[in-house]
């Protein structure tokens, strides 16, 4: 059967529910789809539909994640809900489902719990720009003073982790009652979605960002010069644009003299294109796979950085033994792999497979990276971890 064509009539946004176990994330996800389905903006999903999450094999790790699709008046959403805490950690660190924003679910009856804090911190580290709070189970915890107290605590926590705690929308509702069709609580879901529409920013389209192409191959066309090929990760490139070649060696400046795709010449290449770029005055030996072609000044080479890393379990094809400071695996960024030595934080002697940790890495050669850059860690031909750069330093 042919797949239905995706009609792009509204801007698309990826969001997810985050928060402590049993605070009602999955019930809320089901409630959103059920309430919006009544307006023809979603297909209703029951708790069981959302809960029977398909296993996704994403970059060698198993992530259980459920994707629900729905629309509001102004936007189209893909909503990810993960059943287990470990799945959220993996999902967010690897960027398996990039979140443009998140709905933090907190049970009014429990308040802020350990995973509430961890998910907020993780959201900050992986670059989720804004969070909307849904204070759940308000049909059960009816005391407004208690609800006020929890709201105050959440706002302080958001501010502590660098979010705008004072202005973040906090909606008080009941996912369960809304799912059961109680109109008072259904209205709270509408209120929540209005807040999501207005508070969570539309993601910047990749074409609006500064140009970056990860170089996959280099060859010479006699009489014309050196061509680099690769996929345009973001931005737009035009003939005669000035570009920099960054990473592995000293940064070089050059000018684009031609752009080709499918053996046809183009005026410009944009995000998503696999293109060949002809460069002025560059010898084949001056450039290599693993470097990036970028808009001048938009990204710098770094040898040291701090990252949030998830170490794969042995069942996920990872190591059987823990890692310690001084461990020297390969770090894979885009089209390059570079050896690096890790340093664990003070007081952490080792990291077990299945754990996540913040670590500092020192590479043997500089690589073009920035906050949020994703990478894999490999040794002996197998992937042993995934990470996300939190902070670069020279």
UniProtKB/Swiss-Prot annotation:
Keyword Isomerase among UniProt keywords: no
One GO CC term on file: cytosol
Region (G1): 19-26
Signal peptide: none
Stretches for region G2: 60-64
Domain (tr-type G) ranges: 10-204
Residues covered by region (G3): 81-84
Keyword Ribosomal protein carried by entry: no
Enzyme Commission number(s) of this protein: 3.6.5.3
Chain residues that bind Mg(2+): 26
UniProt-annotated location(s): Cytoplasm
One Gene Ontology molecular-function label: GTP binding
Chemical reaction(s) catalysed: GTP + H2O = GDP + phosphate + H(+)
Region annotation G5: where it falls in the sequence: 174-176
Subunit organization: Monomer.
Family annotation (NCBIfam families): EF-Tu, PRK00049.1, PRK12735.1, PRK12736.1, small_GTP
UniProt family annotation: Belongs to the TRAFAC class translation factor GTPase superfamily. Classic translation factor GTPase family. EF-Tu/EF-1A subfamily.
Protein name as it appears in the record: Elongation factor Tu
Organism: Ureaplasma parvum serovar 3 (strain ATCC 700970)
Upper lineage: Bacteria, Bacillati, Mycoplasmatota, Mycoplasmoidales, Mycoplasmoidaceae
Gene: tuf
């Amino acid at each position: 059967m042919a797949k239905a064509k995706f009609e792009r009539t509204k801007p698309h946004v990826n969001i997810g529910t985050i928060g402590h176990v049993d605070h009602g994330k999955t019930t809320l996800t089901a409630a959103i789809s059920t309430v919006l389905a009544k307006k023809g903006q979603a297909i209703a999903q029951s708790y069981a539909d959302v809960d029977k999450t398909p296993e996704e094999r994403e970059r060698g790790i198993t992530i259980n994640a459920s994707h629900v699709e729905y629309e509001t008046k102004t936007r189209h959403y893909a909503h990810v809900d993960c059943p287990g805490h470990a799945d959220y950690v993996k999902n967010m660190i690897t960027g398996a489902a990039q979140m443009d924003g998140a709905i933090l679910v907190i049970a009014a009856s429990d308040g802020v719990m350990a995973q509430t804090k961890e998910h907020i911190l993780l959201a900050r580290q992986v670059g989720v720009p804004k969070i909307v709070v849904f204070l759940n189970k308000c049909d059960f915890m009816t005391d407004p003073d208690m609800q006020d107290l929890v709201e105050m605590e959440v706002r302080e926590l958001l501010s502590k982790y660098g979010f705008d705690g004072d202005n973040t929308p906090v909606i008080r509702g009941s996912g369960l009652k809304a799912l059961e069709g109680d109109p008072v609580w259904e209205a709270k879901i509408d209120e929540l979605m209005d807040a999501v529409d207005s508070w969570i920013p539309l993601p910047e389209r990749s074409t609006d960002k500064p140009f970056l192409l990860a170089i996959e191959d280099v060859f010479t066309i006699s009489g014309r010069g050196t061509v680099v090929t690769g996929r345009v990760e973001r931005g737009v490139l035009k003939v005669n644009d000035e570009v920099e070649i960054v990473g592995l060696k000293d940064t070089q400046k050059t000018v684009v003299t031609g752009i080709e795709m499918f053996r046809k010449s183009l005026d410009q290449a944009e995000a998503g294109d696999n293109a060949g770029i002809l460069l002025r005055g560059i010898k084949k030996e001056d450039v290599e796979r693993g470097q990036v072609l970028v808009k001048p000044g938009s990204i710098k080479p770094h040898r040291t950085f701090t990252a949030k890393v998830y170490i794969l379990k042995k069942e996920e094809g990872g190591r059987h033994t823990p890692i310690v400071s001084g461990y020297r695996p390969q770090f894979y960024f885009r089209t390059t792999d570079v050896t690096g030595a890790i340093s664990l934080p003070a007081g952490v002697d080792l990291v077990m497979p299945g754990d996540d940790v913040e670590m500092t890495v020192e590479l043997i050669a500089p690589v073009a990276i920035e906050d949020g850059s994703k990478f894999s860690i490999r040794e002996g031909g197998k992937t042993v971890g995934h990470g996300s750069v939190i902070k670069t330093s020279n």
